[in-house]
Design a protein with these regions (language model features):
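Conserved ATP-binding subdomain of kinase catalytic cores across diverse folds
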Residues: 61, 65, 168
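Generic secondary-structure boundary/loop-capping signal
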Residues: 3, 21, 59, 94-95
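Active-site activation/catalytic loop segments of kinase-like enzymes and analogous catalytic loops
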Residues: 28-61, 77-92
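All-alpha amphipathic helical-bundle segments outside canonical DNA-binding/catalytic cores
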Residues: 64-74
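Alpha-helical structural motif
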Residues: 27-30, 66, 78, 101-108
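ATP/Mg2+ or Mg2+-diphosphate-binding catalytic cores
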Residues: 81-167
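Amphipathic, non-membrane alpha-helical segments in soluble helical-bundle scaffolds
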Residues: 21-24, 42, 46, 72
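Active-site acidic catalytic loop and adjacent metal/ATP-binding pocket
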Residues: 1-29, 154-156, 163-164, 168
Length: 168
């Protein structure tokens, strides 16, 4: 759903054009394509991500496997956009529309390269109602309830402390 292919009037969406990308494929690909275009001009990637994924997940629950694949699928769609743009510019150099998404796609792919994939997965898992890190509640409960051996033979809280400064 490239936003340049949506026909709107003052009230709302009236139709879609250019079904060249329409194929039968896993539904997660539709979300990845929608996110790749929505995030291109987003001022707040995580807010946009949250709004779209939350709405999508309310209608189609994402599985853990789909969540783990999402960042790679978004980047793949951006790479495809860039390849097609370069190819079409060579074939039709006078048609600026064929490379209309190129600048924004480069910007977004560079932004996404800075995002830690595990952080991205944790954010999406949280948006979808999962624990951000699988089994994190079990680990947190274990840490809270486990009696660890003392590292020192004294209590750090009950020890006189002196701050030593090493600068001039």
């Amino acid at each position: 759903p490239n936003d340049y292919n949506i026909i709107v009037n003052g009230i709302g969406i009236k139709g879609f054009i250019d079904f060249g990308d329409s194929i039968y494929s896993p539904v997660i690909n539709d979300l990845a394509i929608a996110l790749s275009y929505a995030l291109m001009r987003s001022e707040n990637l995580y807010k946009t991500l949250q709004n779209i994924i939350k709405a999508f997940n309310n209608n189609y629950s994402l599985s853990s496997e789909e969540i783990y694949s999402l960042l790679g699928l978004i980047k793949s769609r951006l790479a495809l956009t860039l390849v097609m743009s370069a190819k079409q510019k060579l074939k039709y150099p006078e048609n600026d529309y064929l490379s209309i998404s190129e600048k924004n796609a480069w910007h977004l792919i560079n932004q996404l390269d800075l995002v830690d994939p595990y952080f991205f997965i944790a954010v999406v898992r949280y948006i979808c109602g999962f624990e951000p890190i699988q089994n994190s509640n079990k680990i947190i409960n274990l840490l809270k309830n486990y009696k660890f051996a003392d590292l020192f033979e004294f209590e750090l809280n009950n020890t006189n402390k002196k701050i030593v400064k090493f600068d001039d």
